[in-house]
Amino acid sequence: MGKVIGIDLGTTNSAMAYYDGKDAKIIANKEGRNTTPSVVAFTDKGEVLVGEPAKRQAITNPERTIYSVKRIMGMMCNEPKAQEAKKHVQYKIVDKNGACAVEVDGKVYTPQEISAKILMKLKKDAEEFFGEEVTEAVITVPAYFNDSQRKATQEAGKIAGLNVLRIINEPTAAALAYGLDKKGEEKILVYDLGGGTFDVTVLEIGDGTFQVLATDGNAFLGGDDFDNRIVDWLISEFKAETGIDLSQDKMALQRLKDAAEQAKKELSTKEETEINLPFITADASGPKHLVKKLTRAKFEAMIDDLLQETLRHIDTALEDAGLSKDEIDEIVMVGGSTRIPKVQELVSNYFNGKKLNKSVNPDEVVALGAAIQAGVLKGDVKDVLLLDVTPLSLGIETLGGVMTKIIEKGTTIPVKKSQVFSTAEDNQTAVTIHVLQGEAELAKDNKSLGQFNLEGIPPAPRGVPQIEVTFDIDANGVLNVSAKDKTSGKEQKITITGSSTLSEEEIERMVREAEEANRKEKARIEAIKARNELDAVAYQAEKFINDNKDKLGDVSALEAKIKEAKELIEQQSEDKAKIEALKNEINTELQNVAQNMAQQQQAQGGAQQQNQNKGGDDDVIDAEVE
Protein backbone atom coordinates (compact mmCIF):
# COMPACT_ATOMS: atom_id res chain seq x y z
CA MET A 1 0.00 0.00 0.00
CA GLY A 2 1.36 3.43 -0.96
CA LYS A 3 1.00 6.68 0.92
CA VAL A 4 -2.39 7.41 2.47
CA ILE A 5 -3.14 11.03 3.34
CA GLY A 6 -5.59 12.48 5.83
CA ILE A 7 -7.68 15.34 4.44
CA ASP A 8 -9.75 17.92 6.27
CA LEU A 9 -12.05 19.13 3.49
CA GLY A 10 -13.21 22.34 5.13
CA THR A 11 -15.81 24.95 4.24
CA THR A 12 -13.32 27.83 4.09
CA ASN A 13 -9.94 26.06 4.27
CA SER A 14 -8.68 22.53 3.72
CA ALA A 15 -5.60 20.78 5.07
CA MET A 16 -3.77 17.49 4.57
CA ALA A 17 -1.43 15.38 6.68
CA TYR A 18 0.33 12.01 6.77
CA TYR A 19 1.52 9.56 9.41
CA ASP A 20 5.27 8.98 9.23
CA GLY A 21 5.36 5.92 11.49
CA LYS A 22 5.75 7.95 14.68
CA ASP A 23 3.71 11.13 14.35
CA ALA A 24 1.11 12.77 12.16
CA LYS A 25 2.55 15.69 10.20
CA ILE A 26 0.97 18.43 8.10
CA ILE A 27 1.83 18.55 4.39
CA ALA A 28 2.35 22.11 3.19
CA ASN A 29 0.78 22.94 -0.17
CA LYS A 30 2.69 24.05 -3.27
CA GLU A 31 2.50 27.66 -2.06
CA GLY A 32 4.18 26.68 1.22
CA ARG A 33 1.08 27.07 3.40
CA ASN A 34 -0.37 24.51 5.81
CA THR A 35 -3.94 25.26 4.75
CA THR A 36 -5.48 25.75 1.31
CA PRO A 37 -8.53 28.00 0.76
CA SER A 38 -11.50 25.86 -0.32
CA VAL A 39 -12.05 28.11 -3.33
CA VAL A 40 -12.34 27.23 -7.03
CA ALA A 41 -12.43 29.85 -9.79
CA PHE A 42 -13.06 29.67 -13.53
CA THR A 43 -11.37 32.43 -15.53
CA ASP A 44 -12.68 33.98 -18.75
CA LYS A 45 -9.80 32.19 -20.52
CA GLY A 46 -11.07 28.79 -19.45
CA GLU A 47 -8.49 28.21 -16.72
CA VAL A 48 -9.42 26.62 -13.40
CA LEU A 49 -7.77 28.12 -10.33
CA VAL A 50 -7.82 26.41 -6.93
CA GLY A 51 -6.84 27.70 -3.50
CA GLU A 52 -4.95 30.94 -2.93
CA PRO A 53 -4.85 32.00 -6.64
CA ALA A 54 -8.65 31.53 -6.83
CA LYS A 55 -9.27 33.50 -3.65
CA ARG A 56 -7.02 36.38 -4.76
CA GLN A 57 -9.04 37.10 -7.90
CA ALA A 58 -12.50 36.73 -6.35
CA ILE A 59 -13.23 40.48 -6.21
CA THR A 60 -12.78 40.94 -9.97
CA ASN A 61 -14.45 37.62 -10.86
CA PRO A 62 -17.23 37.12 -8.27
CA GLU A 63 -19.70 35.13 -10.39
CA ARG A 64 -17.10 32.54 -11.41
CA THR A 65 -15.47 32.11 -7.99
CA ILE A 66 -16.97 29.26 -5.96
CA TYR A 67 -16.44 29.17 -2.18
CA SER A 68 -18.17 27.51 0.80
CA VAL A 69 -19.57 24.84 -1.55
CA LYS A 70 -19.48 22.38 1.35
CA ARG A 71 -22.58 24.15 2.65
CA ILE A 72 -24.68 22.79 -0.23
CA MET A 73 -23.00 19.36 -0.41
CA GLY A 74 -25.61 16.62 -0.59
CA MET A 75 -28.40 19.17 -0.22
CA MET A 76 -31.71 19.40 -2.05
CA CYS A 77 -32.48 22.82 -3.52
CA ASN A 78 -35.88 23.08 -1.83
CA GLU A 79 -34.35 22.84 1.65
CA PRO A 80 -34.53 26.12 3.64
CA LYS A 81 -30.78 26.06 4.27
CA ALA A 82 -30.12 25.88 0.53
CA GLN A 83 -32.28 28.95 0.02
CA GLU A 84 -30.34 30.70 2.79
CA ALA A 85 -27.02 29.78 1.14
CA LYS A 86 -28.15 31.37 -2.14
CA LYS A 87 -28.54 34.76 -0.45
CA HIS A 88 -24.93 34.97 0.65
CA VAL A 89 -22.91 33.94 -2.41
CA GLN A 90 -22.17 35.83 -5.61
CA TYR A 91 -22.14 32.75 -7.84
CA LYS A 92 -25.28 31.07 -9.13
CA ILE A 93 -26.77 28.13 -7.19
CA VAL A 94 -29.16 26.16 -9.40
CA ASP A 95 -31.43 23.14 -9.18
CA LYS A 96 -30.10 19.99 -10.86
CA ASN A 97 -32.64 17.17 -10.65
CA GLY A 98 -33.75 18.58 -7.31
CA ALA A 99 -30.24 18.80 -5.88
CA CYS A 100 -28.13 21.92 -5.40
CA ALA A 101 -25.48 22.67 -8.02
CA VAL A 102 -23.60 25.74 -9.24
CA GLU A 103 -23.67 27.27 -12.70
CA VAL A 104 -20.71 29.03 -14.31
CA ASP A 105 -20.91 30.38 -17.87
CA GLY A 106 -23.86 28.12 -18.66
CA LYS A 107 -22.18 24.93 -17.39
CA VAL A 108 -23.56 23.21 -14.30
CA TYR A 109 -21.23 21.68 -11.72
CA THR A 110 -22.29 19.58 -8.74
CA PRO A 111 -20.80 20.40 -5.31
CA GLN A 112 -19.02 17.04 -5.61
CA GLU A 113 -17.23 18.21 -8.78
CA ILE A 114 -16.17 21.51 -7.20
CA SER A 115 -14.97 19.72 -4.06
CA ALA A 116 -13.12 17.23 -6.26
CA LYS A 117 -11.11 20.09 -7.76
CA ILE A 118 -9.99 21.08 -4.25
CA LEU A 119 -9.14 17.45 -3.47
CA MET A 120 -7.21 17.14 -6.76
CA LYS A 121 -5.12 20.19 -5.79
CA LEU A 122 -4.33 18.62 -2.40
CA LYS A 123 -3.60 15.24 -4.03
CA LYS A 124 -1.24 16.82 -6.56
CA ASP A 125 0.61 18.84 -3.91
CA ALA A 126 0.96 15.72 -1.74
CA GLU A 127 2.38 13.82 -4.72
CA GLU A 128 4.98 16.55 -5.24
CA PHE A 129 5.83 16.35 -1.52
CA PHE A 130 6.26 12.55 -1.55
CA GLY A 131 7.62 12.24 -5.07
CA GLU A 132 5.15 9.44 -5.78
CA GLU A 133 1.51 8.94 -6.68
CA VAL A 134 -1.12 9.23 -3.93
CA THR A 135 -4.33 7.29 -4.54
CA GLU A 136 -5.84 6.73 -1.08
CA ALA A 137 -7.17 9.07 1.59
CA VAL A 138 -9.15 9.38 4.78
CA ILE A 139 -11.47 12.41 4.51
CA THR A 140 -13.21 14.16 7.39
CA VAL A 141 -16.79 15.44 7.54
CA PRO A 142 -18.76 17.32 10.21
CA ALA A 143 -20.18 14.90 12.78
CA TYR A 144 -23.63 16.26 12.00
CA PHE A 145 -23.43 15.54 8.27
CA ASN A 146 -26.34 13.39 7.15
CA ASP A 147 -26.15 10.33 4.91
CA SER A 148 -26.49 12.31 1.65
CA GLN A 149 -23.68 14.66 2.64
CA ARG A 150 -21.38 11.78 3.58
CA LYS A 151 -22.03 9.99 0.30
CA ALA A 152 -21.43 13.22 -1.61
CA THR A 153 -18.04 13.56 0.11
CA GLN A 154 -17.12 10.01 -0.91
CA GLU A 155 -18.17 10.82 -4.47
CA ALA A 156 -15.99 13.95 -4.51
CA GLY A 157 -13.02 11.81 -3.49
CA LYS A 158 -13.75 9.29 -6.23
CA ILE A 159 -14.01 12.03 -8.89
CA ALA A 160 -10.64 13.37 -7.70
CA GLY A 161 -9.04 9.98 -8.30
CA LEU A 162 -8.87 9.02 -4.62
CA ASN A 163 -9.94 5.77 -3.03
CA VAL A 164 -11.59 7.05 0.15
CA LEU A 165 -10.67 4.42 2.74
CA ARG A 166 -12.74 6.01 5.45
CA ILE A 167 -14.99 8.97 6.16
CA ILE A 168 -14.29 10.15 9.73
CA ASN A 169 -16.09 12.76 11.81
CA GLU A 170 -14.12 15.98 12.33
CA PRO A 171 -14.42 16.14 16.15
CA THR A 172 -13.47 12.46 16.40
CA ALA A 173 -10.41 13.11 14.23
CA ALA A 174 -9.48 16.03 16.50
CA ALA A 175 -9.85 13.77 19.54
CA LEU A 176 -7.52 11.21 17.92
CA ALA A 177 -4.85 13.85 17.37
CA TYR A 178 -5.31 15.21 20.90
CA GLY A 179 -5.47 11.92 22.77
CA LEU A 180 -3.20 9.49 20.90
CA ASP A 181 -0.45 9.71 23.52
CA LYS A 182 -2.73 10.07 26.55
CA LYS A 183 -2.38 7.15 28.96
CA GLY A 184 -5.06 7.81 31.58
CA GLU A 185 -8.81 7.81 31.06
CA GLU A 186 -10.50 11.12 30.28
CA LYS A 187 -13.90 12.35 29.34
CA ILE A 188 -13.43 15.13 26.80
CA LEU A 189 -15.72 17.49 24.93
CA VAL A 190 -14.64 18.64 21.48
CA TYR A 191 -16.11 22.04 20.57
CA ASP A 192 -15.60 22.34 16.81
CA LEU A 193 -16.63 25.68 15.31
CA GLY A 194 -15.36 26.01 11.75
CA GLY A 195 -16.08 28.15 8.73
CA GLY A 196 -19.41 26.57 7.88
CA THR A 197 -20.32 23.94 10.45
CA PHE A 198 -20.53 23.41 14.20
CA ASP A 199 -20.18 20.11 16.06
CA VAL A 200 -19.89 19.21 19.71
CA THR A 201 -18.79 15.68 20.55
CA VAL A 202 -18.38 14.02 23.94
CA LEU A 203 -15.84 11.19 24.07
CA GLU A 204 -14.31 8.84 26.58
CA ILE A 205 -10.66 8.20 25.79
CA GLY A 206 -7.96 6.10 27.38
CA ASP A 207 -5.44 3.36 26.57
CA GLY A 208 -5.98 3.72 22.84
CA THR A 209 -9.78 3.55 22.94
CA PHE A 210 -11.74 6.52 21.64
CA GLN A 211 -15.44 6.04 22.33
CA VAL A 212 -17.91 8.68 21.20
CA LEU A 213 -20.63 9.00 23.81
CA ALA A 214 -22.73 11.64 22.05
CA THR A 215 -22.60 14.21 19.28
CA ASP A 216 -24.74 17.18 18.31
CA GLY A 217 -24.45 20.25 16.14
CA ASN A 218 -25.57 22.27 13.15
CA ALA A 219 -24.10 21.67 9.70
CA PHE A 220 -25.02 25.25 8.81
CA LEU A 221 -23.42 27.36 11.54
CA GLY A 222 -19.93 28.82 11.42
CA GLY A 223 -17.56 31.62 10.52
CA ASP A 224 -19.38 32.24 7.23
CA ASP A 225 -22.46 33.24 9.23
CA PHE A 226 -20.42 35.66 11.32
CA ASP A 227 -19.05 37.23 8.12
CA ASN A 228 -22.58 37.50 6.73
CA ARG A 229 -23.74 39.39 9.83
CA ILE A 230 -20.98 41.98 9.27
CA VAL A 231 -21.83 42.21 5.54
CA ASP A 232 -25.54 42.75 6.29
CA TRP A 233 -24.63 45.47 8.81
CA LEU A 234 -22.34 47.23 6.31
CA ILE A 235 -25.04 47.14 3.59
CA SER A 236 -27.60 48.58 6.02
CA GLU A 237 -25.27 51.32 7.29
CA PHE A 238 -24.16 52.32 3.79
CA LYS A 239 -27.75 52.48 2.54
CA ALA A 240 -28.75 54.67 5.50
CA GLU A 241 -25.88 57.06 4.79
CA THR A 242 -26.00 57.23 0.97
CA GLY A 243 -29.34 55.77 -0.11
CA ILE A 244 -27.44 53.23 -2.23
CA ASP A 245 -28.21 49.51 -1.87
CA LEU A 246 -25.06 47.41 -2.37
CA SER A 247 -26.89 44.08 -2.02
CA GLN A 248 -27.36 43.72 -5.80
CA ASP A 249 -23.77 44.68 -6.74
CA LYS A 250 -21.85 41.38 -6.94
CA MET A 251 -18.39 42.95 -7.09
CA ALA A 252 -19.17 45.22 -4.13
CA LEU A 253 -20.57 42.23 -2.20
CA GLN A 254 -17.38 40.26 -2.77
CA ARG A 255 -15.34 43.20 -1.47
CA LEU A 256 -17.65 43.43 1.55
CA LYS A 257 -17.28 39.70 2.23
CA ASP A 258 -13.48 39.86 2.09
CA ALA A 259 -13.45 42.95 4.32
CA ALA A 260 -15.86 41.32 6.80
CA GLU A 261 -13.68 38.21 7.08
CA GLN A 262 -10.61 40.37 7.66
CA ALA A 263 -12.41 42.51 10.26
CA LYS A 264 -13.58 39.38 12.11
CA LYS A 265 -10.00 38.10 12.30
CA GLU A 266 -8.62 41.47 13.45
CA LEU A 267 -11.21 41.70 16.23
CA SER A 268 -9.77 38.54 17.79
CA THR A 269 -6.70 40.59 18.77
CA LYS A 270 -8.00 44.19 18.67
CA GLU A 271 -10.86 46.01 20.38
CA GLU A 272 -11.71 47.97 17.23
CA THR A 273 -11.05 47.76 13.49
CA GLU A 274 -11.68 50.06 10.55
CA ILE A 275 -13.31 48.75 7.38
CA ASN A 276 -12.10 50.99 4.57
CA LEU A 277 -13.33 50.29 1.03
CA PRO A 278 -12.62 53.19 -1.34
CA PHE A 279 -14.62 53.45 -4.58
CA ILE A 280 -17.10 50.79 -3.43
CA THR A 281 -19.64 52.24 -5.88
CA ALA A 282 -20.63 55.48 -7.62
CA ASP A 283 -23.69 57.56 -8.40
CA ALA A 284 -24.40 60.77 -10.33
CA SER A 285 -22.48 62.79 -7.74
CA GLY A 286 -19.34 60.70 -8.18
CA PRO A 287 -17.51 57.80 -6.49
CA LYS A 288 -18.54 56.59 -3.03
CA HIS A 289 -16.27 55.24 -0.33
CA LEU A 290 -17.21 52.99 2.58
CA VAL A 291 -15.42 53.69 5.86
CA LYS A 292 -16.81 52.17 9.06
CA LYS A 293 -15.41 51.40 12.48
CA LEU A 294 -16.46 48.11 14.04
CA THR A 295 -15.81 47.40 17.71
CA ARG A 296 -15.38 43.95 19.20
CA ALA A 297 -18.42 44.59 21.44
CA LYS A 298 -20.60 45.43 18.42
CA PHE A 299 -19.42 42.32 16.56
CA GLU A 300 -20.10 40.12 19.59
CA ALA A 301 -23.62 41.52 19.83
CA MET A 302 -24.18 40.75 16.12
CA ILE A 303 -23.37 37.06 16.54
CA ASP A 304 -24.58 36.46 20.10
CA ASP A 305 -27.65 34.41 19.08
CA LEU A 306 -25.45 32.10 16.98
CA LEU A 307 -23.00 31.59 19.84
CA GLN A 308 -25.85 30.91 22.27
CA GLU A 309 -27.08 28.20 19.89
CA THR A 310 -23.72 26.41 20.20
CA LEU A 311 -24.24 26.25 23.98
CA ARG A 312 -27.66 24.65 23.49
CA HIS A 313 -25.96 21.95 21.41
CA ILE A 314 -23.55 21.34 24.32
CA ASP A 315 -26.61 20.88 26.56
CA THR A 316 -28.00 18.24 24.20
CA ALA A 317 -24.68 16.40 23.80
CA LEU A 318 -24.10 16.20 27.56
CA GLU A 319 -27.69 15.04 28.13
CA ASP A 320 -27.35 12.34 25.45
CA ALA A 321 -24.04 11.23 26.99
CA GLY A 322 -25.60 11.11 30.46
CA LEU A 323 -22.93 13.41 31.88
CA SER A 324 -22.88 16.63 33.87
CA LYS A 325 -20.61 19.61 33.14
CA ASP A 326 -18.39 18.71 36.09
CA GLU A 327 -17.67 15.26 34.68
CA ILE A 328 -15.88 16.68 31.61
CA ASP A 329 -12.09 16.59 32.14
CA GLU A 330 -10.99 18.55 29.07
CA ILE A 331 -12.65 20.91 26.61
CA VAL A 332 -10.74 20.77 23.31
CA MET A 333 -11.27 23.79 21.05
CA VAL A 334 -11.18 23.05 17.32
CA GLY A 335 -11.86 25.12 14.18
CA GLY A 336 -10.68 28.59 13.18
CA SER A 337 -13.74 30.32 14.65
CA THR A 338 -12.75 29.23 18.19
CA ARG A 339 -10.10 31.97 18.05
CA ILE A 340 -12.88 34.51 18.66
CA PRO A 341 -12.44 35.66 22.30
CA LYS A 342 -16.21 35.70 22.97
CA VAL A 343 -16.47 32.05 21.90
CA GLN A 344 -13.76 31.08 24.39
CA GLU A 345 -15.34 33.19 27.14
CA LEU A 346 -18.82 31.70 26.66
CA VAL A 347 -17.60 28.09 26.58
CA SER A 348 -15.36 28.58 29.63
CA ASN A 349 -18.21 30.25 31.55
CA TYR A 350 -20.57 27.42 30.55
CA PHE A 351 -18.20 25.03 32.32
CA ASN A 352 -18.02 27.29 35.40
CA GLY A 353 -14.78 29.01 34.42
CA LYS A 354 -12.94 25.83 33.46
CA LYS A 355 -9.72 26.42 31.50
CA LEU A 356 -10.07 25.47 27.84
CA ASN A 357 -7.59 23.13 26.20
CA LYS A 358 -5.98 25.02 23.32
CA SER A 359 -2.98 22.71 22.96
CA VAL A 360 -3.95 21.74 19.40
CA ASN A 361 -3.75 23.94 16.31
CA PRO A 362 -7.45 24.53 15.50
CA ASP A 363 -6.79 24.70 11.74
CA GLU A 364 -4.62 21.58 11.52
CA VAL A 365 -5.75 19.14 14.21
CA VAL A 366 -8.56 17.57 12.14
CA ALA A 367 -6.22 16.74 9.23
CA LEU A 368 -3.69 15.32 11.71
CA GLY A 369 -6.41 13.11 13.18
CA ALA A 370 -7.40 11.92 9.71
CA ALA A 371 -3.75 11.01 9.08
CA ILE A 372 -3.69 9.00 12.33
CA GLN A 373 -6.83 7.15 11.19
CA ALA A 374 -5.03 6.46 7.90
CA GLY A 375 -2.17 5.06 10.00
CA VAL A 376 -4.63 2.84 11.87
CA LEU A 377 -6.06 1.49 8.60
CA LYS A 378 -2.55 0.85 7.21
CA GLY A 379 -1.49 -0.91 10.41
CA ASP A 380 1.14 1.70 11.29
CA VAL A 381 -0.76 2.80 14.42
CA LYS A 382 -1.33 -0.11 16.78
CA ASP A 383 -3.82 -0.64 19.59
CA VAL A 384 -6.22 2.16 18.67
CA LEU A 385 -9.94 1.46 18.76
CA LEU A 386 -12.28 4.13 17.46
CA LEU A 387 -15.97 3.80 18.32
CA ASP A 388 -18.06 6.52 16.68
CA VAL A 389 -21.82 7.00 16.66
CA THR A 390 -24.54 7.93 14.20
CA PRO A 391 -25.48 11.60 14.76
CA LEU A 392 -29.14 11.30 13.75
CA SER A 393 -31.84 8.65 14.01
CA LEU A 394 -32.71 6.64 10.91
CA GLY A 395 -36.03 5.08 10.03
CA ILE A 396 -38.87 4.76 7.55
CA GLU A 397 -42.25 6.39 6.97
CA THR A 398 -45.13 4.27 8.22
CA LEU A 399 -48.94 4.56 8.21
CA GLY A 400 -50.20 8.06 8.99
CA GLY A 401 -47.02 9.81 7.85
CA VAL A 402 -45.16 8.86 11.03
CA MET A 403 -41.41 8.18 11.18
CA THR A 404 -40.63 4.82 12.75
CA LYS A 405 -37.01 4.73 13.95
CA ILE A 406 -34.93 1.67 13.20
CA ILE A 407 -31.54 2.98 14.38
CA GLU A 408 -31.59 5.54 17.18
CA LYS A 409 -29.34 8.61 17.32
CA GLY A 410 -26.10 7.90 19.21
CA THR A 411 -25.87 4.23 18.23
CA THR A 412 -22.27 3.02 17.93
CA ILE A 413 -21.25 2.28 14.34
CA PRO A 414 -20.84 0.10 12.36
CA VAL A 415 -24.29 -1.32 13.10
CA LYS A 416 -26.94 -3.45 11.41
CA LYS A 417 -30.55 -3.53 12.61
CA SER A 418 -33.76 -5.03 11.24
CA GLN A 419 -37.44 -4.55 11.93
CA VAL A 420 -40.48 -6.37 10.51
CA PHE A 421 -43.37 -4.38 8.99
CA SER A 422 -46.52 -5.38 7.10
CA THR A 423 -48.96 -4.07 4.50
CA ALA A 424 -51.59 -1.39 5.16
CA GLU A 425 -54.22 -2.73 2.73
CA ASP A 426 -55.68 -6.09 1.66
CA ASN A 427 -54.01 -7.78 -1.33
CA GLN A 428 -51.24 -5.17 -1.45
CA THR A 429 -48.52 -6.50 -3.79
CA ALA A 430 -45.99 -3.69 -3.42
CA VAL A 431 -44.74 -1.38 -0.68
CA THR A 432 -42.78 1.86 -0.87
CA ILE A 433 -39.93 2.14 1.60
CA HIS A 434 -39.32 5.85 2.32
CA VAL A 435 -36.01 6.23 4.20
CA LEU A 436 -35.70 9.15 6.63
CA GLN A 437 -33.08 10.72 8.88
CA GLY A 438 -33.84 12.99 11.83
CA GLU A 439 -35.53 13.27 15.22
CA ALA A 440 -39.01 14.59 14.32
CA GLU A 441 -42.13 12.47 14.91
CA LEU A 442 -43.63 13.18 11.49
CA ALA A 443 -41.94 11.95 8.31
CA LYS A 444 -42.36 15.28 6.51
CA ASP A 445 -40.27 17.08 9.15
CA ASN A 446 -37.23 14.83 8.65
CA LYS A 447 -34.58 14.61 5.94
CA SER A 448 -35.69 12.32 3.12
CA LEU A 449 -32.79 10.13 2.01
CA GLY A 450 -34.75 8.46 -0.77
CA GLN A 451 -37.24 5.72 -1.44
CA PHE A 452 -37.61 2.43 -3.27
CA ASN A 453 -40.30 -0.13 -4.01
CA LEU A 454 -40.50 -3.76 -2.96
CA GLU A 455 -42.73 -5.50 -5.49
CA GLY A 456 -44.02 -9.03 -6.02
CA ILE A 457 -45.55 -9.49 -2.56
CA PRO A 458 -48.11 -12.36 -2.72
CA PRO A 459 -51.70 -11.03 -2.24
CA ALA A 460 -52.85 -11.43 1.37
CA PRO A 461 -55.01 -9.66 3.96
CA ARG A 462 -53.49 -6.51 5.45
CA GLY A 463 -51.09 -7.19 8.29
CA VAL A 464 -50.26 -10.71 7.10
CA PRO A 465 -47.15 -10.22 4.86
CA GLN A 466 -43.87 -10.07 6.77
CA ILE A 467 -41.57 -7.39 5.32
CA GLU A 468 -38.18 -7.21 6.99
CA VAL A 469 -36.45 -3.83 6.61
CA THR A 470 -32.70 -3.83 7.36
CA PHE A 471 -30.58 -0.74 7.99
CA ASP A 472 -26.83 -1.24 7.76
CA ILE A 473 -24.48 1.65 8.67
CA ASP A 474 -20.82 1.10 7.81
CA ALA A 475 -17.75 2.57 9.53
CA ASN A 476 -18.04 5.66 7.32
CA GLY A 477 -21.48 6.40 8.75
CA VAL A 478 -22.99 5.64 5.33
CA LEU A 479 -26.31 3.82 5.18
CA ASN A 480 -27.44 0.86 3.09
CA VAL A 481 -31.07 -0.25 3.25
CA SER A 482 -32.78 -3.43 2.09
CA ALA A 483 -36.33 -4.79 2.32
CA LYS A 484 -37.24 -8.47 2.10
CA ASP A 485 -40.63 -10.19 1.89
CA LYS A 486 -40.12 -13.17 4.19
CA THR A 487 -42.86 -15.18 2.46
CA SER A 488 -41.70 -14.93 -1.15
CA GLY A 489 -38.03 -14.25 -0.43
CA LYS A 490 -38.15 -11.20 -2.72
CA GLU A 491 -35.54 -8.63 -1.74
CA GLN A 492 -34.81 -5.08 -2.87
CA LYS A 493 -31.95 -2.80 -1.92
CA ILE A 494 -32.31 0.95 -1.91
CA THR A 495 -31.94 2.93 -5.08
CA ILE A 496 -32.09 6.55 -4.03
CA THR A 497 -34.50 8.58 -6.17
CA GLY A 498 -34.66 12.34 -6.26
CA SER A 499 -31.55 12.47 -4.11
CA SER A 500 -28.48 14.66 -4.13
CA THR A 501 -26.20 11.65 -4.55
CA LEU A 502 -24.84 10.72 -7.96
CA SER A 503 -25.33 7.56 -10.00
CA GLU A 504 -22.33 5.37 -10.84
CA GLU A 505 -22.59 6.53 -14.46
CA GLU A 506 -22.47 10.19 -13.39
CA ILE A 507 -19.47 9.55 -11.14
CA GLU A 508 -17.63 7.72 -13.92
CA ARG A 509 -18.38 10.57 -16.33
CA MET A 510 -17.12 13.11 -13.81
CA VAL A 511 -13.99 11.04 -13.19
CA ARG A 512 -13.33 11.03 -16.95
CA GLU A 513 -13.99 14.78 -17.16
CA ALA A 514 -11.69 15.41 -14.19
CA GLU A 515 -8.95 13.31 -15.79
CA GLU A 516 -9.43 15.18 -19.07
CA ALA A 517 -9.33 18.53 -17.24
CA ASN A 518 -6.17 17.36 -15.48
CA ARG A 519 -4.63 16.37 -18.81
CA LYS A 520 -5.54 19.76 -20.30
CA GLU A 521 -4.12 21.54 -17.27
CA LYS A 522 -0.85 19.61 -17.62
CA ALA A 523 -0.78 20.45 -21.33
CA ARG A 524 -1.46 24.11 -20.50
CA ILE A 525 1.41 24.19 -17.98
CA GLU A 526 3.72 22.47 -20.47
CA ALA A 527 2.70 25.04 -23.11
CA ILE A 528 3.49 27.87 -20.67
CA LYS A 529 6.94 26.37 -20.02
CA ALA A 530 7.49 25.98 -23.76
CA ARG A 531 6.41 29.63 -24.36
CA ASN A 532 8.81 30.80 -21.65
CA GLU A 533 11.65 28.87 -23.27
CA LEU A 534 10.71 30.30 -26.69
CA ASP A 535 10.61 33.79 -25.18
CA ALA A 536 14.12 33.33 -23.75
CA VAL A 537 15.51 32.03 -27.07
CA ALA A 538 13.84 34.83 -29.07
CA TYR A 539 15.20 37.41 -26.61
CA GLN A 540 18.75 36.04 -26.92
CA ALA A 541 18.49 36.00 -30.72
CA GLU A 542 17.21 39.60 -30.82
CA LYS A 543 19.94 40.71 -28.40
CA PHE A 544 22.58 39.00 -30.56
CA ILE A 545 21.33 40.87 -33.64
CA ASN A 546 21.29 44.23 -31.80
CA ASP A 547 24.76 43.69 -30.31
CA ASN A 548 26.32 42.70 -33.65
CA LYS A 549 24.46 44.87 -36.20
CA ASP A 550 27.64 46.05 -37.94
CA LYS A 551 29.08 42.57 -38.29
CA LEU A 552 26.07 40.67 -39.61
CA GLY A 553 24.93 40.00 -43.13
CA ASP A 554 21.35 39.12 -44.05
CA VAL A 555 19.37 38.27 -40.87
CA SER A 556 15.87 38.71 -42.32
CA ALA A 557 15.05 34.98 -41.89
CA LEU A 558 16.00 35.10 -38.20
CA GLU A 559 14.10 38.36 -37.65
CA ALA A 560 10.99 36.83 -39.26
CA LYS A 561 11.15 33.89 -36.85
CA ILE A 562 11.63 36.22 -33.86
CA LYS A 563 8.54 38.13 -34.98
CA GLU A 564 6.59 34.86 -35.28
CA ALA A 565 7.73 33.88 -31.78
CA LYS A 566 6.50 37.18 -30.33
CA GLU A 567 3.11 36.67 -31.99
CA LEU A 568 2.77 33.13 -30.58
CA ILE A 569 3.67 34.40 -27.10
CA GLU A 570 1.26 37.33 -27.41
CA GLN A 571 -1.54 34.95 -28.47
CA GLN A 572 -0.65 32.65 -25.54
CA SER A 573 -0.57 29.74 -27.95
CA GLU A 574 -0.97 26.31 -26.36
CA ASP A 575 0.32 24.45 -29.43
CA LYS A 576 3.37 22.97 -27.70
CA ALA A 577 4.65 21.20 -30.82
CA LYS A 578 4.53 24.41 -32.86
CA ILE A 579 6.20 26.41 -30.07
CA GLU A 580 9.03 23.90 -29.66
CA ALA A 581 9.52 23.61 -33.43
CA LEU A 582 9.85 27.40 -33.71
CA LYS A 583 12.27 27.48 -30.77
CA ASN A 584 14.47 24.90 -32.53
CA GLU A 585 14.26 26.83 -35.81
CA ILE A 586 15.38 30.06 -34.08
CA ASN A 587 18.26 28.21 -32.41
CA THR A 588 19.33 26.71 -35.75
CA GLU A 589 19.03 30.03 -37.58
CA LEU A 590 20.91 31.82 -34.79
CA GLN A 591 23.73 29.28 -35.03
CA ASN A 592 23.88 29.79 -38.80
CA VAL A 593 24.00 33.59 -38.41
CA ALA A 594 26.67 33.34 -35.70
CA GLN A 595 28.67 30.88 -37.83
CA ASN A 596 28.45 33.15 -40.88
CA MET A 597 29.58 36.10 -38.78
CA ALA A 598 32.53 34.12 -37.42
CA GLN A 599 33.53 32.97 -40.93
CA GLN A 600 33.23 36.53 -42.21
CA GLN A 601 35.41 37.83 -39.40
CA GLN A 602 37.91 35.05 -40.03
CA ALA A 603 38.00 35.87 -43.74
CA GLN A 604 38.50 39.55 -43.00
CA GLY A 605 41.31 38.71 -40.58
CA GLY A 606 43.07 36.56 -43.22
CA ALA A 607 42.83 39.30 -45.86
CA GLN A 608 44.35 41.85 -43.49
CA GLN A 609 47.26 39.51 -42.74
CA GLN A 610 47.95 39.05 -46.47
CA ASN A 611 47.95 42.79 -47.03
CA GLN A 612 50.39 43.24 -44.18
CA ASN A 613 52.68 40.59 -45.68
CA LYS A 614 52.57 42.22 -49.12
CA GLY A 615 53.38 45.62 -47.66
CA GLY A 616 56.42 44.11 -45.90
CA ASP A 617 57.93 42.78 -49.19
CA ASP A 618 57.81 46.22 -50.88
CA ASP A 619 59.95 47.74 -48.15
CA VAL A 620 62.81 45.21 -48.53
CA ILE A 621 65.94 46.62 -50.28
CA ASP A 622 68.04 44.14 -52.16
CA ALA A 623 71.78 44.73 -51.56
CA GLU A 624 74.90 42.81 -51.57
CA VAL A 625 76.85 42.50 -48.39
CA GLU A 626 80.41 43.29 -48.80
Curated annotation (Swiss-Prot):
Statement: the UniProt record of this protein carries the keyword Nucleotide-binding: yes
Induction and repression of expression: By stress conditions e.g. heat shock.
InterPro entries to which the protein is assigned, alphabetical: ATPase_NBD, Chaperone_DnaK, Heat_shock_70_CS, HSP70_peptide-bd_sf, Hsp_70_fam
Matches recorded under PROSITE patterns: HSP70_1, HSP70_2, HSP70_3
UniProt keyword Chaperone present: yes
Annotated GO MF terms: ATP binding; ATP-dependent protein folding chaperone; unfolded protein binding
Alphabetically ordered keywords of this record: ATP-binding, Chaperone, Nucleotide-binding, Phosphoprotein, Stress response
Chain intervals with Low complexity compositional bias: 595-614
A family per Pfam: HSP70
SUPFAM superfamilies (alphabetical): Actin-like ATPase domain (SSF53067), Heat shock protein 70kD (HSP70), peptide-binding domain (SSF100920)
Domain of life, source organism: Bacteria
Region Disordered, residue ranges: 595-626
Coiled-coil stretches: none
In-chain residues carrying the UniProt-annotated modification Phosphothreonine: 197
Annotated signal peptide: none
Role: Acts as a chaperone.
Family: Belongs to the heat shock protein 70 family.
UniProt name for this protein: Chaperone protein DnaK
Organism encoding this protein: Nautilia profundicola (strain ATCC BAA-1463 / DSM 18972 / AmH)
GN (gene name): dnaK
